[in-house]
Amino acid sequence: MAVGKNKRLSKGKKGLKKRTQDPFSRKDEYSVKAPSTFAVRDVGKTLVNRTTGLKNANDSLKGRIFEVSLADLQNDEDHAFRKVKLRVDEVQGKNCLTNFHGLDFTSDKLRSLVRKWQTLIEANVTVKTTDDYLLRLFAIAFTKRRPNQIKKTTYARSSQIRAIRKKITEIIQREASSRTLAQLTKLIPEVIGREIEKSTHGIYPLQNVHIRKVKLLKSPKFDLGALLALHGESSTDDKGQKVEREFKEQVLESV
């Protein structure tokens, strides 16, 4: 074996080793705020790269969508199967102000509702709120046994399904088109489902009636004042208020 330099071993790397910078050192933390229609306002934190040159951090945050459990927003475990989508519309300081962007059910809840020996009835309605939000609401309902029923199955006839679907459409249209988006988000979880169940009892008894999904199709032109009012931060009501103070006339002592 020839004795000599092993080029592979002696060959060193050119230049010094680059320092690896922690990517999180270039990021800032912002708080995500839910609208005042929910009981809990603090959703969580989000990270974004700091403003450098022409790239503004606020522009990167606007439009971000967060999916939050309604149970966390309302401090109520009964709503754990509902997921609310919130979209960042404005950034004020270190706070991201969000607005309602949609609602959905968890897949495990939807699977648990579907059972044998009953009829599943679905309907979807496109509605416009009074503040010009275009929404599509998806309703779901299941038939149930009548009192003192002996038969195992609870299948509804096609004519009954059509009548129930028509009733669902009418109720959703009436409730949604006469309210703002903020008012509608309060009704969606429970109120509309109970109203449908009560109204369709004469056609066929229903159970597990829910608005399972809400899809935001179109938003009106962005209005900062409306968003601040939604978050309870509007200062329009405080302007121009008369301040009541007692006026005491100063009497100068005669010299």
Curated annotation (Swiss-Prot):
Output the PROSITE patterns linked to this UniProt entry.
RIBOSOMAL_S3AE
Is Nucleus set as a keyword in this record?
no
Q: Does the keyword Ribosomal protein apply?
A: yes
Q: Where in the cell is it found?
A: Cytoplasm
In terms of superkingdom, the source organism counts as: Eukaryota
* Entry's Gene Ontology molecular function annotations: structural constituent of ribosome
**A GO BP entry:** translation
Q: Where is this region: Disordered?
A: 1-28
Q: Where is the composition biased (Basic residues)?
A: 1-18
Write out the entry's keywords from A to Z: Acetylation, Cytoplasm, Ribonucleoprotein, Ribosomal protein
Gene Ontology CC entries for this record:
cytosolic small ribosomal subunit
Skewed-composition ranges (Basic and acidic residues): 19-28
Q: Which residues carry this modification: N-acetylalanine?
A: A2
| Subunit-level organization | Component of the small ribosomal subunit. Mature ribosomes consist of a small (40S) and a large (60S) subunit. The 40S subunit contains about 33 different proteins and 1 molecule of RNA (18S). The 60S subunit contains about 49 different proteins and 3 molecules of RNA (25S, 5.8S and 5S).
Q: Which HAMAP family match?
A: Ribosomal_eS1_euk
Q: Which PANTHER family match?
A: 40S RIBOSOMAL PROTEIN S3A
Family from the record: Belongs to the eukaryotic ribosomal protein eS1 family.
Its name, as the record gives it, is Small ribosomal subunit protein eS1
**What organism, scientifically named, is this protein from?**
Ajellomyces capsulatus (strain NAm1 / WU24)
Q: What is the lineage of its organism?
A: Eukaryota, Fungi, Dikarya, Ascomycota, Pezizomycotina
